[in-house]
Swiss-Prot record:
Protein family (similarity comment): Belongs to the archaeal Rpo11/eukaryotic RPB11/RPC19 RNA polymerase subunit family.
Self-association and partners: Part of the RNA polymerase complex.
Function: DNA-dependent RNA polymerase (RNAP) catalyzes the transcription of DNA into RNA using the four ribonucleoside triphosphates as substrates.
UniProt KW Membrane keyword: no
GO MF term set: DNA binding; DNA-directed RNA polymerase activity; protein dimerization activity
GO cellular component terms given for this protein: cytoplasm; DNA-directed RNA polymerase complex
Organism: Thermoplasma volcanium (strain ATCC 51530 / DSM 4299 / JCM 9571 / NBRC 15438 / GSS1)
Listed Pfam families: RNA_pol_L_2
Compartments where found: Cytoplasm
Protein name per its UniProtKB record: DNA-directed RNA polymerase subunit Rpo11
Domain of life: Archaea
Gene Ontology BP terms: DNA-templated transcription
Swiss-Prot/TrEMBL keywords: Cytoplasm, DNA-directed RNA polymerase, Nucleotidyltransferase, Transcription, Transferase
Ion transport keyword on record: no
Length: 111
């Protein structure tokens, strides 16, 4: 399907079988999709996962996931939850380190 002319992100199920799914990722960056597919591949129930783009300018990327058992969309959801938690923890660590840096580098004035 041709790329939409908006900046909003969304997705669309292109096809769904018992053990596989293809999802079009509308206006998502390849960097994010690569990370998502790498996380999906860590799932023990996943046989295959990949993303591809038919044409880089006019088409949106699609993710393909095939599972041994369970639902393929569940594997995608599990991976998204894991990545969300990872980035949430990373954000908290960054905030903590920035605060620590600030408290160690405050210019102290004398009265």
């Amino acid at each position: 399907m041709q790329r939409e002319r908006t900046n909003e992100t969304s997705l669309r199920v292109v096809s769904k079988e018992k053990d596989s799914i293809i999802v079009e990722m509308i206006n998502y960056d390849n960097t994010l999709l690569r990370t998502l597919v790498e996380e999906i591949l860590k799932d023990d129930q996943v046989i295959e996962a990949r993303y591809y783009i038919k044409h880089p300018i006019i088409d949106n990327p699609q993710i393909y996931v095939k599972v041994k058992s369970g639902k393929p969309q569940a594997a995608i959801k599990r991976s998204i939850r894991k990545l969300s938690k990872l980035y949430e923890d990373l954000g908290a660590q960054v905030e903590k380190e920035i605060e620590k840096y600030r408290s160690n580098h405050i210019i102290k004035t004398t009265e």
